[in-house]
Amino acid sequence: MKALVKAKREEGIWMQHDVPVPEVGVHDVMIRVTKSAICGTDVHIYNWDEWSQKTVPVPMVVGHEYVGRVEKVGAEVEAFRPGERVSGEGHVTCGFCRNCRAGRRHLCRHTVGVGVNRPGSFAEYVVIPADNVYRIPDDIPDDIAAIFDPFGNATHTALSFDLVGEDVLVTGAGPIGVMAAAIARHVGARHVVVTDVNDYRLDLARRMGASRAVNVAKEDLRAVMSELGMREGFDVGLEMSGNGRAFRQLLEVMNHGGKVALLGIMAGPEPIDWSQVVFKGLQLKGVYGREMYETWYKMVAMLQSGLDLTAVVTHRFSIDDFQQGFDVMRSGRSGKVVLDWGAAR
């Protein structure tokens, strides 16, 4: 089959046409991929950075954001049938550790990542356990279904705390950050402010519904807060940037008793002023992946109740033009990039 493969321990990803079709175990589902999306993780793997070198075995079929149709099911699978439109949870869990057995599978210490530690979805076919397959309702378009993985990250982070009537700061205007901003507005936040230094992505945040999108290299965040009539500080902070300076600024402008969810991953150890956390009585929560499968139910429900993510998909290419997709993702001038397998030559 055709697939995008991390075939060498160097920068790049390569199209190969002779990749073996993955085998279907008795509890597995084979999915014929129709659309894939490029994740920031895929860019890290493309760049072959330090994390990728330590994490990804080579060769590896990459990719974990996709939508497709069931092609084949294992002998013990009864919940799905060929032809159904589905996506899949990208974290494959052990099912036996304490967290898995308690229903907290997103905290499994033995998690294996699709497209990172096992063959992924930048391929004509991907095989995952039936427990990881999620059926997509007919009223959700393919482009949005293909980005359920990062949409799930945004949902899990944004809904970590009650947002109704709250003032929310989102640090980082990447695709997950701007989706989190849209979610916050959808569920009833008062002011949603997004910060970054990338004007392209700040404009995307505005189109996704942010009250204000602030380039902190050019604007004073506290002045923006005053302009919005905020007298104390932000009630909820969503750290999506993985940037230490942005996180420190977030702590400075949080209200006493505020709550902070962190999804962004710092490149290394970062100093912070712990007195901001202690004396303000802040709550900090680390977020990983998606709650299985409460996050997925909430994603569908929000889309069906009017949440509009259309603007976050900014570029579309045939899978044969995947290099253009990676180039635009690496430029920083894009939202989500979707690759169409149906348009392949």
Curated annotation (Swiss-Prot):
Annotated organism of origin: Anaeromyxobacter dehalogenans (strain 2CP-1 / ATCC BAA-258)
Protein name (database record): L-threonine 3-dehydrogenase
Site (Important for catalytic activity for the proton relay mechanism but does not participate directly in the coordination of zinc atom): 149
Gene Ontology annotations of biological process type: L-threonine catabolic process to glycine
One Gene Ontology MF term: zinc ion binding
SMART domains in the cross-refs: PKS_ER (SM00829)
PROSITE patterns in the cross-refs: ADH_ZINC (PS00059)
Annotated binding of NAD(+), by residue: 176, 196, 201, 263-265, 287-288
Gene behind this protein: tdh
Lineage: Bacteria, Pseudomonadati, Myxococcota, Myxococcia, Myxococcales
Enzyme Commission code: 1.1.1.103
GO cellular component, one term: cytoplasm
Annotated cofactor note: Binds 2 Zn(2+) ions per subunit.
Broadest EC class assigned to this enzyme: oxidoreductase
Alphabetized UniProt keyword annotations: Cytoplasm, Metal-binding, NAD, Oxidoreductase, Zinc
Binding site for Zn(2+) 2: 94, 97, 100, 108
